Amino acid sequence: MQLLNFLICLFFIFKRCVFTVIGGEFSYDNIDKKPILVASYPEGSRFNVSASIKTLPDLVTLTFPKLVKDPGYVYEEAEKGDPESQFLIAMLYAMGPDERLGLSFPRNEPLSRIFLELSATQNYTYALLALAYKHLNGLSTPMSVDKGVELYKQVAHQISCLVQPLSHFAPDIAAEYPVDLYDLSRTSSYSVQKKDDIVEYLKDYALRGNNISAHISLATIYQYGTPGKLKDIKLAVKHYLAAIRLVNSGIPDSPSEAIKSIHNNPRHAPTTKETANSLSIAAFRLGCMALHGELGKPDPSLAYAWFEYGVSLNHSSSKAAIAYMYFMGYPVAENTESITKLLENALASNDPLAFAVAGKVSLANGQIDEATVHLIRAVSNGHLESVLHIADIYYGSNNQLSIAYYENFISRVLELFDVKTISFDPLTRHFAHRLSAELGNLMSQILAAKDRDPSTSYLKTVIFPTNEQTHRNARIAMNYYSRAAARNHIHSLIKIGDFYRMGLGTSAKPELAFSYYSQAAAIHPSALAYWRLGWMHEYGVGVPVDFEMAKKNYDNALMHDTRAFLAVTLARLRMRLSSPDSWFSNIYRILGKVTYKFLKLVQYFIINIFDILSPAGPDSQLPPEPPTLQVDRTPQQPDPQETSESLPSPNTEEMGESYNDIRFTYDYIDGRFLETACVTLIVVVVGLVLMRRHQQHRLQERRERIIRRQNRA
């Protein structure tokens, strides 16, 4: 098998020599090192954005249907030298077989590395990013921080063409919506349905109420897009001009003609501060769109005219934008005095864009310390370009900080973690999470692990037995949790401890689980970590039974999170009942055994019911085998010992007789339906009880009213 892999390597190295390299060696500059030459850019372009550079949601949307429909075709395209197909094949070999996606590529790190190298020689963005992550973490390649940070820098500057220097304030989704919540769909503010309702409300308010703020809000949604709502520049321009037209009536529908009309026929100044602010926002954004080429060809003169209108309304960002244009030498020669004066006025208003422009000016003058101060202020306000400049400043002197800023910049520009994936169907969303996780995005690693985590269902881990499918999913989840835990993510450390405690995806190792919980509690006080430590001390799992230490850890859990009050109260009661000094201890142990027997009976009852309902036997309930590649398209499958992850294999002896005796497991039952049915049954019972009590209360009130009427009569 080693000889086979060696021959395959030689084959692909030979093919690399004869492939046509698209684009050659990639050369890059910092964003806006030199002015944009309007004549060199086609109409509709945006800073000469390369068509090959896509955000991750766009890449997944375009490629996932092709992978599911005909993975062999994608493999053939990779053999022909297509860099995108080579990257996708490399990721499939890195991820291994996935029955949920219907993809059966074997896990083969050597082949994955070969395809990545082939794609990277053509400067394909995502291949370079994947190699950078592998070099930094020593995944299937020797660890090299210098090589990793060098590749991160190359990727960051390669995708800088997607950044709009003046108006690109991309939110840091990972910071605003941490995956510690474990379910992004609960983020109601980003619900697609809610966004649609807001858009309809704003339309009605803007058109019927002639409200300038509603027009600005609608234009913002159409300019930048939202989950489930694509960008529409024409509608954005329409609403920006509609907002301006409420004050400057009669202006044309063309941005260039509109600004000429405003300059030739000046109207009265806005009557309120809110109106002036809305007008200045519209003027500033129209200027940015003109400069960035979103209105056609990049037009610095038109942009300058709109920025001047914003300055006349005392808009600080418009002042910073004109200072930026003076600095870049767009419509006029560089004017140091004008730059200084405009920036001083904008900085006095604490304008984020002013800090970004001031940082760039300081960088050009060699004032690194002053530039760092200004750029960090801009970064704290969400300015995306400044993140790249800070990363460049730290490059070579502080690789740790440089890597952190490069990762942040790349993740936000390529949208490696974004709420847009909420609108994807479950399979596409799962593929996006796994692909982003392989590229090193922390939040996606946690979501990819959660997608395959068998411990997320209480019924699945308590009532139903574990089997090979459960352990296979657990190993995939454990792989991603391990990558996140290596970056000190608290919940991932706790999850790995759970897997070792329960023996999911690995043999049960309570002592190792205890060490993971202790590490999580030491890095950052976590109520869940303290709760797990208390539970292990209470039951003597991995450590001797110690009620005092259990109580101490339970108290720490309550101290760090008041939501643990009920759980801690029940734990204290449980310890009091199970204490050897209490005469309740024997009763408590008997109740525990009865409960366990009841769960086993429920387990066997459900399994037997499905056996009875399946006349062809339990094997007929198994999902179909995923489609495989044709023999002539796929290399030979490698030896599992050569490609297995550094994760312990499950100890089948510890699974018990349930693995061999129970033929049909929960993994082939619609788990969501079963859990939903159980919860619905509980809700119905509780609802009936409450309804009955309410009816009795109403009947009692009615009787009392009748008695009072009779007494008055």
UniProtKB/Swiss-Prot annotation:
Pfam families: Sel1. Disulfide bonds: none annotated. Residues 1-20 form the signal peptide. Belongs to the sel-1 family. One of its GO terms (biological process) is ERAD pathway. Gene3D superfamilies: Tetratricopeptide repeat domain. It is a single-pass membrane protein. It is found in: Endoplasmic reticulum membrane. SMART domains: SEL1. Residues 621-655 are annotated as: Disordered. This is Putative ERAD-associated E3 ubiquitin-protein ligase component. GO terms for cellular component: endoplasmic reticulum; Hrd1p ubiquitin ligase complex. Keywords: Endoplasmic reticulum, Glycoprotein, Membrane, Repeat, Signal, Transmembrane, Transmembrane helix. Component of the endoplasmic reticulum quality control (ERQC) system involved in ubiquitin-dependent degradation of missfolded endoplasmic reticulum proteins. Residues 631-652 have a biased composition (Polar residues).
